[in-house]
Structure formats: C-alpha cells, structure tokens
C-alpha cells in the first residue's frame, strides 16, 4: 500500500477565510490525505468571519519539511503570509522538491510575493489586477492547474478546489467516490 499523501494548510496569524480552510481540509481528509494546519504558533487563529482554528503545528516546526501539497487560503490575513520569509522558504523548498502548491481566493498573491511561478492562475476578482500586473496570466475558471500550482477563485469554489487536489493526488476514482456523500453528485 502506498504511503498516505500529506497536505499542509498555512494559516495567517488572523483573518484567514474560514470556508476555504475548513472545506479544503475536510475534503482532503475524506480523500485520504493527512492534513496539518500550520500557524505562526499553535495558538488559535481567529478567522475573517470569527471562527477559530487551532493549528496542529507552528511554522518553525515544518519549515524544512516537504508535503505533497502546501495550501494557501485567502482572506485578508494572507497578506501576512506574503510578508513572512519563512513562508517564502517553505514554498521555494516545495517547488524544488516537485511538490504541489494550492492557493485560493487572495492566496495566489502569496505566490507573487515570494516569486513562485505559475504561467496561468485564477483568483478572487479583487486581486486579479495585482496578479496580472505581476506577470501571471489570469483565467476566468473556478480552478486552474499550471506548473504544479492549483489555484481557485474563492469561498464558493472551495469544494471544487479541494476535489481537484484530491483528483490530482489520489486519482479521479477517489474524487468520484466523494461526490455522492458530499451531495455534489451530478
């Protein structure tokens, strides 16, 4: 049996978009991935709409590790991730190792801030201009995969984003097995 795949979801000190964090993490667990939430410490993070999420680990404890995917949620707090050198190191190590990076909503601006390349992206409409001015080609799709980077528009596309990650890491059969229990079957 293959080793369980791993995902690291990055949490800013505050103001993450909780739908993107919670839905993505939950779907990935249902898809068979081991999910860790990392914050600046292990103190609870107050999200943009008031939910509190307790990180499993502090960033300093995972900065030299690699994961199958590292995920950057959006929300106003992702600007703190863009300013954090440890996040930059973590993402660059992830790219060098050939791992995936996922970014949703305003999360792609963290890629821009740390020089992570993806030819095409999608993102929240409020940061579209910033991304195109930064040299990324914007696509008006709910989810875009380009150069081992998976991006998505925002809270309303969180299920589609998470399912695309599961499909990429575990295959379409696994993704299809999740649709009916999640009431997403067509």
Swiss-Prot record:
Residue ranges the record marks as coiled coil:
none
Matching Pfam families: DJ-1_PfpI
| Enzyme Commission number, as recorded | 4.2.1.130
Task: Extract one GO cellular component term from the record.
Answer: nucleus
Q: What induces it?
A: Induced by DAF-16 during starvation as well as in the dauer stage.
Name the organs or tissues of expression. Expressed in various tissues, including pharyngeal muscles, pharynx-intestinal valve, ventral nerve cord, spermatheca, rectal gland, inner labial (IL) cells of head neurons, phasmid (PHA/PHB) neurons in tail and supporting sheath/socket cells, as well as in head mesodermal cells (HMC), excretory canals and coelomocytes.
| Biological processes annotated in GO | cellular response to glyoxal; cellular response to methylglyoxal; glycolate biosynthetic process; glyoxal metabolic process; lactate biosynthetic process; methylglyoxal metabolic process; negative regulation of oxidative stress-induced intrinsic apoptotic signaling pathway; response to oxidative stress
Q: Where in the cell is it found?
A: Cytoplasm
One GO MF annotation is: glyoxalase III activity
- CDD domains the UniProt entry points to: GATase1_DJ-1
Q: Which residues form the active site?
A: 20, 105, 124
Q: Per the annotation, which location comes first and is thus the protein's main one? A: cytoplasm
Source domain of life is Eukaryota
| Keyword annotations | Cytoplasm, Lyase
Name the reaction it catalyses.
methylglyoxal + H2O = (R)-lactate + H(+)
> What functional role does this protein have?
Catalyzes the conversion of methylglyoxal (MG) or glyoxal (GO) to D-lactate or glycolic acid respectively in a single glutathione (GSH)-independent step. May play a role in detoxifying endogenously produced glyoxals. Involved in protection against glyoxal-induced cell death. Protects dopaminergic neurons from glyoxal-dependent neuronal degeneration.
Q: Tell me the protein family, please.
A: Belongs to the peptidase C56 family. DJ-1 subfamily.
**NCBIfam families xref list:** not_thiJ
Protein name in UniProt? Glutathione-independent glyoxalase DJR-1.2
This chain's source organism reads Caenorhabditis elegans
């Amino acid at each position: 049996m293959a080793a369980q795949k791993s995902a690291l979801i990055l949490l800013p000190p505050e103001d993450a978009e909780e739908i993107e964090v919670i839905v993505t993490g939950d779907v990935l667990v249902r898809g068979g991935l081991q999910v860790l939430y990392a914050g600046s410490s292990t103190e609870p993070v107050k999200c943009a709409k008031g939910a509190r999420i307790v990180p499993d680990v502090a960033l300093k404890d995972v900065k030299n590790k690699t994961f199958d995917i590292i995920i950057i949620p959006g929300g106003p707090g992702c600007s703190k991730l863009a300013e954090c050198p440890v996040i930059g190191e973590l993402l660059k190590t992830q790219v060098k190792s050939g791992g995936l990076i996922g970014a949703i909503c305003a999360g792609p601006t963290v890629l821009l801030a740390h020089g992570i390349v993806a030819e095409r992206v999608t993102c929240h409409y409020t940061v579209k201009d910033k991304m195109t001015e930064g040299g990324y080609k914007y696509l008006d799709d709910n989810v875009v995969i380009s150069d081992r980077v998976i991006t998505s528009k925002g809270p309303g596309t969180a299920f589609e984003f998470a399912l695309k990650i599961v499909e990429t890491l575990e295959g379409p059969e696994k993704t299809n097995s999740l649709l009916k229990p999640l009431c997403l079957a067509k």
